[in-house]
From Swiss-Prot:
<dbReference type="GO" id="GO:0045202">
    <property type="term" value="C:synapse"/>
</dbReference>
<dbReference type="Pfam" id="PF03522">
    <property type="entry name" value="SLC12"/>
</dbReference>
<keyword id="KW-0479">Metal-binding</keyword>
<feature type="transmembrane region" description="Helical; Name=12">
    <location>
        <begin position="636"/>
        <end position="651"/>
    </location>
</feature>
<feature type="modified residue" description="Phosphothreonine">
    <location>
        <position position="973"/>
    </location>
</feature>
<keyword id="KW-0812">Transmembrane</keyword>
<keyword id="KW-0868">Chloride</keyword>
<dbReference type="InterPro" id="IPR000076">
    <property type="entry name" value="KCL_cotranspt"/>
</dbReference>
<feature type="glycosylation site" description="N-linked (GlcNAc...) asparagine">
    <location>
        <position position="331"/>
    </location>
</feature>
<comment type="similarity">
    <text>Belongs to the SLC12A transporter family. K/Cl co-transporter subfamily.</text>
</comment>
<feature type="binding site">
    <location>
        <position position="135"/>
    </location>
    <ligand>
        <name>chloride 2</name>
    </ligand>
</feature>
<feature type="transmembrane region" description="Discontinuously helical; Name=1">
    <location>
        <begin position="120"/>
        <end position="142"/>
    </location>
</feature>
<dbReference type="GO" id="GO:0071333">
    <property type="term" value="P:cellular response to glucose stimulus"/>
</dbReference>
<feature type="topological domain" description="Cytoplasmic">
    <location>
        <begin position="599"/>
        <end position="612"/>
    </location>
</feature>
<dbReference type="GO" id="GO:0019901">
    <property type="term" value="F:protein kinase binding"/>
</dbReference>
<feature type="binding site">
    <location>
        <position position="131"/>
    </location>
    <ligand>
        <name>K(+)</name>
    </ligand>
</feature>
<feature type="topological domain" description="Extracellular">
    <location>
        <begin position="143"/>
        <end position="149"/>
    </location>
</feature>
Length: 1083
C-alpha cells in the first residue's frame, strides 16, 4: 500500500520566515548548519542508479580546467557537457533481437552491432512484396473469383487490403515513434501495450508465422503432386471417392519430408536462405509479369484451350481425348472414349448413364480472352455445396430423375462447400506479410523513414495486383474453369498457368520456388520470434527456448517451431490451415491498431511519431475491421484464438510480469482509482512514460491571494490537461490559529485554477515556519504513484531587497531539496511577463540553450508547450555551446541527427565561445558581489542601513555593467567602496560585536576576489552575452540551471551568478533535471 515519509526537524531552529512561500528564511545571526567539508543531501547532484543519469561514484576534483563553463564545473561528473555527449547520442546502434533491453542495460557495455546498410527498396519494399504475394495468388485466387464472382471477390480483396493498409498506417506511427531495435513487430506491440498484451499477441504472431510455414509447405507439395509430377504420389485411390483421402495422405508424407528438409537447411545455413531470398522474389515477379503478358495476348490471340461440357456440367479431361459421344472413322460411326466412360460397353446399344443420354456434349474455350464478353457471366457469385457439379450458367440441361452421383464418372466436382465468409478466411493470408520490413528494422539505414514508405508502397502495389487480377481473371477465363480448383478440365494443368505467357511452366516453376522460399522464410523468422519472447522472460516456461547455439541461432525454438508446423501439415489441407493463421494474424493486426489508438488518445509526451498521416479513428477502424474479419472468417476459430490469447494474458499477469517497457496500458492506470494507484506504486515510470507531474509552489500575500497568477497559466499551458498537477502553498503559524486563513487561501487558489481551466489538486500546508512547510510539500505531496516529479516556482525577484537579508536561503534550500528528492526544478523568471491562456503568439521562437545534459528536459518542455494554442505557432531553436577544441560542424550534424531520432523539429545552431581573458568588468562585478557578502556577514546593521548598503552596491553594479557594454574596455576596479555610515557608528558596531574580530572589516577594503568566483562570474557574463546576442527577442528562453555550491558558504554568490546569467532577458525558464532521463530516442 502507498507509504509516505516526511523528514521533519528534530531540534528547534531559529529560522524566521520571509515573505515568500517558496523562499527559505533564516534569522540573522543563526549559525550555519552545514559543514563545507561534509555537504548534505541536495548539494550538487543526486546519486541514483539507472534510469537516473548520474552513475558516477567517484568525485573528480579537477574535471574541468577552463574558464568558460566554470559555473557548471561542480556538476560535470553527472551532467556532462553537450559537446562531449552529442556524438554518442546521435550515433546510436541498434540492439539485436533478444538481447537485454536497452532500458535495463544502461550501465553495462553495449553490444557492438554491424552498421545497418539496407535502404527502403531492398530492406522493406521487396521483402514485403515477397511475403504478401504467394501461394494463394497462384493456387486459389482464380477459384475464389469463380465462386464469389468478380464483385464479391473484389469486395473480399478490398476489405482485406483495407485492413492491412490501416494496420500499416498504425504500424508506421509506432515504428516512427523512436528507434526500433531489431525485433520488429513483436517489439513494437509488446513495448506499446505492455508485457501481458505483448506476450499474448507475440505468441499469437509466432503461431501465425508457424502455421504460415505449414501453409506454404502444403502449397509447395500441392504444386508438386498436382501439376509437376502427379506420378510421384505414394498413395493411389482405388475408387473416385478415395481420391481426396489419397491426396491428403500424400500431402502429409511429402509435407513432413519437406518440413524436415527445410528445418535442416535453416539449422545448418540460415545465411543461404537469406541469399536465396532475391532468387525466390525474382520467381514471384516473373510469374506475375507472365500473367499480365498472357492477359494482353488473349486480347488479340486467345489460346486454344477446349473444355468439354455434358449438358451444363463440366467434364474432367482425363481418359478421353475427343469431346464427343461418337465420331466418324472410315465412313463409319464409332463410339469414343468418353462414351465408354458413361456406358457399360462400346456398342451403340450399350446401357448408358441417363444424364449422358439426355444431354449433348459441347466444347467451349476455357480462356476466350478479354474481348469475349465473358466478364458479365462471371460478375455474380456461384456458391455450391461439397460434391456439387461445376456447371456453366446459361446453358440448357435436361434434368434427370436420378439424383445419385455414381462414382467413376469424369465430372468436375467441388471438394468443399463454398460461401462468402469461408472465402474471406482462405484469402486473408495472401495479404499478410506486411511486417516483413519491420522485422528487419535492425538492418535498415533509417528505419523511421523506410518502414512506412516501403510497407505502404508494397501494400499499394500488391493491392493493385490482386484487384487487377480479379478483374482480368473474370474478363478472360470461363466461369467453369475458374471454379475448377485443380484444373481437371484442363488435363490437370494449373488454371493461372494456362493464362500465362509464354508457357504454363513459368507459373508452375515460379510458384513452386516462391512457396518453397516463403516456407523457408517462415521457418527462419518464427524461431527468432519465439527466442525474443523467451528472452524477455515474461513467460517462464518458455525461457528454455531463449537458448541456442553459440552464434545465437535459436536451436530449441526451431525444434518447437517444426513440431507445431507439423501439426499444420498433418491437417494436410491448405483450405483448412489458411483460416487458422488468418485468426492469429488478424489478432496481431488488431492489437497493433489498438496500440496506436491508445497511445494517440493518451497523448503521452513520448508519443511523437515522425509519420504524421495517422489518426486514432483510423486505428480504431482498423481494429474494428480486424475483429469483424476474425468472426467473418470463422467465429469458432476466432473464439478459440481469443481464448488462447486471454489465457496467456492471465498467466503472465498471474506470474507477475515484472517488466517495465513504458507501454501505453501503464498510462491508463493513472486514470483509475485505487487499483491503478497500487499498480503504479512500484518504482519510477519508464523513460517513455515520463511526463512532468508538477508541484506548483505558489506565494500568497497577506490577504491569502496568489501573488503570481500567471504561474498557473504557464502550468496549464505546459500540462494541457494531462497528468498530475498539485498546487501547493505554505502559511506560517499553527493550524489551530490559521485554519480559517488556510481555508480562504485554498478557496482562492481553487477559484484561480478554475479560471485558468487547470485540472489538478490543491494542497496547502500550515507550518511554524515557511522553510519547513515548503520542505514538507516537496517530500509528501501526492499519493502513491500519483506523486510529483517536478517542482515549478517563480524566481524571487526581490531577493536582494527582502526584509530578511537571508531570504535567498529559502530559494537555495528549495533547489537542494528538489535535488535530494530526485525531482526536476523549473524556475520561471519574470513570471509576470509570461502569457495568459487567452493570449496567442502569432510568431516568435522558443530558444533552448542546452549547455549540459541533465536528462533531456530542455528538449521535452518546448515540445509540450507547443501543444498548447498559446505557443503553437512558435518555432523551436536549440543552441549549444562549443569550446575551442570542439568540432562545431560535426556537433551540429550530431545534434540534428539526435533531434531526428527524438522526432522533434527544431532549428539547430552551435555557438562557439572563445576562451578569452577575464574582463575587468567581470573582475569588478565579482569583487562587488564578495564585498556585499562580507559586509552583510561581518556587520550587524540596522534594517534600513542594511537595505541602503545592499541597494548602493546593486546600483553601482548595474551602472558599471551599463558602462562595460557601451564601451569596448570596462572601467578599472575602484580602489575602495564608499560607505554611508560614520566612523563613530563603525566603532560602536565593532565594540558591540567583538566576537567577530577586528580584522574582518579592515580586510574588506583590501579584499581580492576569489579566483573560483571570478571564473564562475566569467561563465555567467559570457553566457549571458551570447544568449542576449541570439535570443533577446525570443518569446521564451530555456536555460540549464547550474546547481547550488556544495559549500553553503557561497549560497549568496550563487544567487548573483543566476541573476547575471539571465540579465536582460524577458521570459526565462531555468531548468534543472531531476537526475534521470526523461526523453528517449527509442520506441
Amino acid at each position: 500500500m502507498p507509504t509516505n515519509f516526511t523528514v521533519v526537524p528534530v531540534e528547534a531552529r531559529a529560522d524566521g520566515a520571509g515573505d515568500e512561500a517558496a523562499e527559505r528564511t533564516e534569522e540573522p545571526g543563526s549559525p550555519e548548519s552545514a559543514d563545507p567539508a561534509c555537504p548534505t543531501p541536495g548539494d550538487g547532484n543526486p546519486r541514483e542508479n539507472s534510469p537516473f543519469i548520474n552513475n558516477v561514484e567517484v568525485e573528480r576534483e579537477s574535471y574541468f580546467e577552463g574558464k568558460n563553463m566554470a559555473l557548471f564545473e561542480e556538476e560535470m561528473d553527472s551532467n556532462p557537457m553537450v559537446s562531449s555527449l552529442l556524438n554518442k547520442l546521435a550515433n546510436y546502434t541498434n540492439l539485436s533481437q533478444g538481447v537485454v533491453e536497452h532500458e535495463e542495460d544502461e550501465d553495462s557495455r553495449r553490444r557492438e552491432i554491424k552498421a545497418p546498410r539496407m535502404g527502403t527498396f531492398i530492406g522493406v519494399y521487396l521483402p514485403c512484396l515477397q511475403n504478401i504475394l504467394g501461394v494463394i495468388l497462384f493456387l486459389r485466387l482464380t477459384w475464389i473469383v469463380g465462386a464469389a464472382g468478380v464483385l464479391e471477390s473484389f469486395l473480399i480483396v478490398a476489405m482485406c487490403c483495407t485492413c492491412t493498409m490501416l494496420t500499416a498506417i498504425s504500424m508506421s506511427a509506432i515504428a516512427t515513434n523512436g528507434v526500433v531495435p531489431a525485433g520488429g513487430s513483436y517489439y513494437m506491440i509488446s513495448r506499446s501495450l505492455g508485457p501481458e498484451f505483448g506476450g499474448a499477441v507475440g505468441l499469437c504472431f509466432y503461431l501465425g508465422t508457424t502455421f504460415a510455414g505449414a501453409m506454404y509447405i502444403l502449397g509447395t507439395i500441392e504444386i508438386f503432386l498436382t501439376y509437376i509430377s502427379p506420378s510421384a504420389a505414394i498413395f493411389q485411390a482405388e475408387t473416385a471417392d478415395g481420391e481426396a483421402a489419397a491426396l491428403l495422405n500424400n500431402m502429409r508424407v511429402y509435407g513432413s519430408c519437406a518440413l524436415a528438409l527445410m528445418a535442416v537447411v535453416v539449422f545448418v545455413g540460415v545465411k543461404y536462405v537469406n541469399k536465396l531470398a532475391l532468387v525466390f522474389l525474382a520467381c514471384v515477379v516473373l510469374s506475375i509479369l507472365a500473367i499480365y503478358a498472357g492477359v494482353i495476348k488473349t486480347a488479340f490471340a486467345p489460346p486454344d484451350i477446349p473444355v468439354c461440357l455434358l449438358g451444363n456440367r463440366t467434364l474432367a479431361n482425363r481418359n478421353f481425348d475427343t469431346c464427343a459421344k461418337m465420331q466418324v472413322v472410315s465412313n463409319g460411326t464409332v463410339t469414343t472414349a468418353l462414351w465408354r466412360l458413361f456406358c457399360n460397353g462400346s456398342s451403340l446399344g450399350a446401357s448408358c448413364d441417363e444424364y449422358f443420354v439426355q444431354n449433348n456434349v459441347t466444347e467451349i474455350q476455357g480462356i476466350p480472352g478479354v474481348a469475349s464478353g465473358v466478364f458479365l457471366d462471371n460478375l455474380w457469385s456461384t456458391y455450391s455445396d461439397k460434391g456439387a457439379f461445376v456447371e456453366k450458367k446459361g446453358v440448357s440441361s435436361v434434368p434427370v430423375s436420378e439424383e445419385s452421383r455414381p462414382g467413376g464418372l469424369p465430372y468436375v466436382l467441388t471438394d468443399i462447400m463454398t460461401y462468402f465468409t469461408m472465402l474471406v478466411g482462405i484469402y486473408f493470408p495472401s495479404v499478410t506479410g506486411i511486417m516483413a520490413g519491420s522485422n528487419r528494422s535492425g538492418d535498415l539505414k533509417d528505419a523511421q523513414k523506410s518502414i512506412p514508405t516501403g510497407t505502404i508502397l508494397a501494400i499499394v502495389t500488391t493491392s493493385f495486383i490482386y484487384l487487377s487480377c480479379i478483374v482480368l481473371f473474370g474478363a478472360c477465363i470461363e466461369g467453369v474453369v475458374l471454379r475448377d480448383k485443380f484444373g481437371e478440365a484442363l488435363q490437370g494443368n494449373l488454371v493461372i498457368g494456362m493464362l500465362a505467357w509464354p508457357s504454363p511452366w513459368v507459373i508452375v516453376i515460379g510458384s513452386f520456388f516462391s512457396t518453397c522460399g516463403a516456407g523457408l522464410q517462415s521457418l527462419t523468422g518464427a524461431p527468432r520470434l519465439l527466442q525474443a519472447i523467451a528472452r524477455d522472460g515474461i513467460i517462464p516456461f518458455l525461457q528454455v527456448f531463449g537458448h541456442g547455439k553459440a552464434n545465437g541461432e535459436p536451436t530449441w525454438a526451431l525444434l518447437l517451431t517444426a513440431l507445431i508446423c507439423e501439426t499444420g501439415i498433418l491437417i494436410a489441407s491448405l483450405d483448412s490451415v489458411a483460416p487458422i493463421l488468418s485468426m492469429f494474424f488478424l489478432m496481431c493486426y488488431m492489437f497493433v491498431n489498438l496500440a496506436c489508438a491508445v497511445q494517440t488518445l493518451l497523448r503521452t509526451p513520448n508519443w511523437r511519431p515522425r509519420f504524421k498521416f495517422y489518426h486514432w479513428t483510423l486505428s480504431f477502424l482498423g481494429m474494428s475491421l480486424c475483429l469483424a474479419l476474425m468472426f467473418i472468417c470463422s467465429w469458432y476459430y476466432a473464439l478459440f484464438a481469443m481464448l488462447i490469447a486471454g489465457c496467456i494474458y492471465k498467466y503472465i499477469e498471474y506470474r507477475g510480469a515484472e517488466k517495465e517497457w513504458g507501454d501505453g496500458i501503464r498510462g491508463l492506470s493513472l486514470n483509475a482509482a485505487r487499483y491503478a494507484l497500487l499498480r503504479v506504486e512500484h518504482g519510477p515510470p519508464h523513460t517513455k512514460n515520463w511526463r512532468p507531474q508538477v508541484l506548483v509552489m505558489l506565494n500568497l500575500d497577506s490577504e491569502q491571494c496568489v501573488k503570481h497568477p500567471r504561474l498557473l497559466s504557464f502550468t496549464s499551458q505546459l500540462k494541457a490537461g494531462k497528468g498530475l498537477t498539485i498546487v501547493g502553498s505554505v502559511l506560517e503559524g499553527t493550524y489551530l490559529d490559521k485554519h480559517v486563513e488556510a481555508q480562504r487561501a485554498e478557496e482562492n487558489i481553487r477559484s484561480l485554477m478554475s479560471a485558468e481551466k487547470m485540472k489538478g489538486f490543491c494542497q496547502l500546508v500550515v507550518s511554524s515556519n515557511l522553510r519547513d512547510g515548503a520542505s514538507h510539500l516537496i517530500q509528501s505531496a501526492g499519493l502513491g504513484g500519483m506523486k510529483h516529479n517536478t517542482v515549478l516556482m517563480a524566481w524571487p525577484e526581490a531577493w536582494k531587497q527582502a526584509d530578511n537579508p537571508f531570504s535567498w536561503k529559502n530559494f537555495v534550500d528549495t533547489v537542494r531539496d528538489t535535488t535530494a528528492a530526485h525531482q526536476a526544478l523549473l524556475v520561471a523568471k519574470n513570471i509576470d511577463l509570461f502569457p495568459q491562456n487567452q493570449e496567442r503568439f502569432s510568431d516568435g521562437n522558443i530558444d533552448v540553450w542546452w549547455i549540459v545534459h541533465d536528462g533531456g528536459m530542455l528538449m521535452l518542455l518546448p515540445f509540450l508547450l507547443r501543444q498548447h494554442k498559446v505557443w503553437r505557432k512558435c518555432r523551436m531553436r536549440i543552441f549549444t555551446v562549443a569550446q575551442v577544441d570542439d568540432n562545431s560542424i560535426q556537433m551540429k550534424k550530431d545534434l540534428q541527427m539526435f533531434l531526428y531520432h527524438l522526432r522533434i523539429s527544431a532549428e539547430v545552431e552551435v555557438v562557439e565561445m572563445v576562451e578569452n581573458d577575464i574582463s575587468a568588468f567581470t573582475y569588478e562585478k565579482t569583487l562587488m558581489m564578495e564585498q556585499r557578502s562580507q559586509m552583510l556577514k561581518q556587520m550587524q546593521l540596522s534594517k534600513n542601513e542594511r537595505e541602503r548598503e545592499a541597494q548602493l552596491i546593486h546600483d553601482r553594479n548595474t551602472a558599471s555593467h551599463t558602462v562595460a557594454t557601451a564601451r569596448t574596455e570596462a572601467p578599472p576596479t575602484p580602489d575602495k567602496v564608499q560607505m554611508t555610515w560614520t566612523k563613530e557608528k563603525l566603532i560602536a558596531e565593532k565594540h558591540r560585536n567583538k566576537d567577530t574580530g577586528t580584522s574582518g572589516f579592515k580586510d574588506l577594503f583590501s579584499l581580492k576576489p576569489d579566483q573560483s568566483n571570478v571564473r564562475r562570474m566569467h561563465t555567467a557574463v559570457k553566457l549571458n552575452g551570447v544568449v542576449l546576442n541570439k535570443s533577446q527577442d525570443a518569446q521564451l528562453v530555456l536555460l540549464n540551471m547550474p546547481g547550488p555550491p556544495k559549500s553553503r558558504q557561497g549560497d549568496e554568490n550563487y544567487m548573483e551568478f543566476l541573476e547575471v546569467l539571465t540579465e536582460g532577458l524577458n521570459r526565462v525558464l531555468l531548468v534543472r533535471g531531476g537526475g534521470r532521463e526523461v526523453i528517449t530516442i527509442y520506441s
